[in-house]
Amino acid sequence: MPRQISLEKTRNIGIMAHIDAGKTTTTERILFYAGKIRKVAETHEGGAQMDWMEQEKERGITITSAATTCQWKEHKVNIIDTPGHVDFTVEVERSLRVLDGSVAVFCAKGGVQPQSETVWRQADKYRVPRMAFINKMDILGADFYQTIGMIKDRLGTNPVPLQLPIGKEDTFVGIVDLIKMNAVIYKDDLGQDMETTEIPEDMKELAREYREKLVEAAAETDEELMMKYLEGEELTEEEIVAGIRRGTVNVQFTPVICGSSYKNKGVQLLLDAVVAYMPSPLDIPAIKGITPDDEEEVERHSDDNEPFSALAFKIMADPYVGKLAFFRVYSGVLDAGSHVLNSTKGKRERIGRILQMHANTREEVSTVYAGDIAAAVGLKDTTTGDTLCDPDHVVILESMVFPEPVIHVAVEPKTKAGQEKMGIALQKLAEEDPTFKTYTDEETGQTIIAGMGELHLEIIVDRLLREFKVEANVGKPQVAYKETITQAVEVECKYARQSGGRGQYGHVKIRVIPQEPGKGYEFANQVVGGTIPKEYIPAVDAGIQGAMQAGVLGGYEVVDVRVELYDGSYHDVDSSEMAFKIAGSMAFKDGMRKGKAVLLEPYMKVEVTTPEDYMGEVIGDLNSRRGKIEGMEARSNGMQVINAYVPLSEMFGYATDLRSKTQGRATYSMHFDHYEAVPASIAEKITASK
């Protein structure tokens, strides 16, 4: 079947925001106006179509990014709703990887909140074009202009308003359209009845001022337009729109519009803006990949005639069809029932059925084209970040890198019968979520689950019960400490065993060098003259990596070291891979002992918003938790924002303490930032308790 909607008229967008900025409600309204939903649901009543996991309905927050397809004015819009809670940044990260553009939703009262910054930085990393929707213009304390200022100062982008609000809080009735230079007034509760009229007299001067900024921003995207503008000529509406689109697609600035999704104001205009200014798959650069044989770089363009290539960006267990793999098609066409190659794993896969998702209902399609987002049934070996491609034109697209978990807890089923069920369930959940890990502690035999924060693990335990009917007891959260060295050392190890017959002989000399934080592990072979034969070098590397799994201080994973193998010797008869593996392992452990090993702990970036009266208490409490106060800023509503870095080990139970210290008036958010050395006195206690 030929393509129904052209690539130019396809939009793949994400909706991203801080928790509670109104993101899911905004998506709901978009689907309502695009005709996908009959009745509008309210998120805080637990009825939203996008929030379809049980826990999401209860908590009123979005956890898994649901991909939805809808149509607006002859355009196909694929929307990915992403979670705003910091524990779920992995969902945001992988959504951004497959999107062409994004709508950032801000609360007109809260402005740019910490998670907005985190998500914005993630979008910067992938150079995703963005537009901003300032939501909740109807609530007490809404301030459009303050939010614009925060977008500029905190996110480092140039916000260009396309609209100005008419009134605010209770009196928010409509918007001024700065392109058409008219006013749009909402006449009914559903936002269906809109009246276009003249700009109110008291806003004309302000509208002219902002229109001038808008026209200048549009003109700066094109030399011809700039000349016309500088010569004092008027730009046409078409030229302004084309300029804004160009500037948005090239990430030169961020167009801003406003409304109130809950009150159904501004959502159709948001859809119009998505169609007008967000990029189509043709506007984004070709995706790069490598050929597995010779690692040559190749490009795939958004074109149905190119060989098929796609990226699997999410795996989900579905109660009706089993495993669902969400993927983005970058080039070519895919038919249901056809065979593809999972080039990341080197395995052929058969596509069973192809589904286009609408929150949690689905429509079966026979073919998907370049630029489409869909879900496939029947992919057995595919996991998040894998490339699917035409077996005759093999390519591996750049995969996604996910952060390591920072917190872990022990779990055990309440019944003996639950043990096997729990093992299977945890494996399935780990398949879905690359930042969730599960393993068995070899010393205690306990099952350990590890993730990005307390809420993350709570949701996992909750899902064990709801989806897999496994009741589990959960231990106390533990911090994921790491180890590293602080001093470069040279060590040698000669491993020789003679016990009748063939012996074991491996001799290595290595340098162990500390790396800057986050650099990871590097191994360099600097052996010259064949003092260690080539075939034994990988064994030395494997031995070192094995030893890194359990450091010398408390048995924690070792990170951020470079090891240079520069010399050694071998024996014609007695040397073996095993001997060199053991020699590498022993040499590394010796290097750790001599290299002044230190314990590292995760530090969280914490932002506390508190009334001024409690500032002293809150700061004193953060200091007592070994926090480092980075800065403070006053908000217009009498609140103070405190930014700090605090060790994760000191943050357990913080929510309860903060509530009691501020009579429930302060809020906080935190996310993992970096690892740092633990003070010696505390490190001793930690290692002694192991």
Swiss-Prot record:
Pfam families, sorted: EF-G_D2 (PF22042), EFG_C (PF00679), EFG_III (PF14492), EFG_IV (PF03764), GTP_EFTU (PF00009)
Domain of life, per lineage: Bacteria
Residue ranges of domain tr-type G in the record: 8-282
Positions that bind GTP: 17-24, 81-85, 135-138
Record GO biological process: ribosome disassembly
GO cellular component terms, A-Z: cytoplasm
Subcellular location: Cytoplasm
SUPFAM superfamilies: EF-G C-terminal domain-like, P-loop containing nucleoside triphosphate hydrolases, Ribosomal protein S5 domain 2-like, Translation proteins
GO molecular function: GTP binding; GTPase activity; translation elongation factor activity
Family stated for the protein in its record: Belongs to the TRAFAC class translation factor GTPase superfamily. Classic translation factor GTPase family. EF-G/EF-2 subfamily.
NCBIfam families reported for this sequence: EF-G (TIGR00484), PRK12740.1-3 (NF009379), PRK12740.1-5 (NF009381), small_GTP (TIGR00231)
PANTHER family assigned to the protein according to its UniProt record, in alphabetical order: RIBOSOME-RELEASING FACTOR 2, MITOCHONDRIAL (PTHR43261:SF1), TRANSLATION ELONGATION FACTOR G-RELATED (PTHR43261)
Protein name: Elongation factor G
Organism from which the protein derives: Alkaliphilus oremlandii (strain OhILAs)
